[in-house]
């Protein structure tokens, strides 16, 4: 039946982290199906076997040597369309939660640590979209999934009109596809698996 939670949900967080941290080099993954049967249709008493993952746990290494982990699940009781990430570095950290898309939490180690704790700590920074050449939607509009999709379409059409390559492009999509396929191989065979780009060339 193809991919489950990894392909459906994981592709988005993998793409987002790719744009922030660069290409992936290797992955170690566990994919599992916790609910083995589901109704054939909403309200149907007939059950059908589930043959795709509903949870995926990935350890990743980027080409630049960054290590990280990604958890993707259809099993998050009480969650809606949550997407969160945390990135920790030597000089600071970032936290983002798509439930509050207008804010990015930033920690800067250069902030004074004294007296009495100083100014250290995570700060919320406004993360409204102010993009070069932006016409609509206006930056004053609350960020959400619809606005993000509209901005993607606008930037693509703008690239076409200006005669330049659009980003992300097909190669970026193929890279994420290669990462997910490497995750499937890792889950099936165990251990770390290199991301093989040439299989889609």
Segments and roles (model prediction):
Residues 1-80, 171:
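Rossmann-like dinucleotide-binding domain that binds NAD(P)(H)
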Residues 13-14, 153-154, 180:
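A general structural signal for well-ordered alpha-helical segments in protein cores
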Residues 22, 158-162, 188:
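Residues at helix-coil transition
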Residues 36-57, 61-62, 85-86, 91-168, ...:
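C-terminal glycine/acidic-rich active-site capping loop/insertion
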Residues 156, 173, 190:
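Hydrophobic, well-ordered secondary-structure elements that form the walls
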Residues 173-187:
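C-terminal hydrophobic helical "lid"/dimerization subdomain
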Residues 185-201:
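C-terminal capping/lid region of NAD(P)-dependent oxidoreductase domains
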């Amino acid at each position: 039946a193809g991919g489950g939670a990894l392909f459906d949900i994981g592709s988005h967080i993998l793409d987002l982290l790719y744009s922030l941290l660069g290409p992936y080099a290797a992955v170690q993954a566990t994919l599992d199906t916790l609910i083995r049967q589901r109704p054939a249709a909403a309200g149907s008493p007939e059950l059908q076997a589930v043959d795709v993952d509903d949870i995926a746990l990935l350890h990743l290494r980027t080409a630049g040597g960054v290590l990280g982990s990604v958890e993707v699940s259809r099993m998050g009781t009480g969650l809606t369309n949550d997407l969160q990430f945390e990135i920790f570095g030597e000089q600071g950290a970032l936290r983002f939660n798509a439930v509050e898309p207008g804010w990015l939490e930033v920690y800067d180690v250069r902030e004074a640590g004294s007296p009495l704790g100083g100014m250290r700590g995570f700060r919320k920074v406004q993360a409204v979209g102010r993009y070069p050449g932006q016409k609509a939607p206006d930056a004053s509009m609350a960020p959400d999934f619809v606005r993000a999709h509209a901005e993607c379409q606008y930037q693509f059409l703008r690239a076409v009109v200006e005669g330049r390559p659009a980003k992300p492009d097909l190669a970026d999509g193929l890279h994420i596809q290669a990462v997910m396929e490497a995750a499937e191989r890792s889950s099936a065979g165990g251990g770390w698996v290199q991301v093989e780009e040439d299989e889609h060339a």
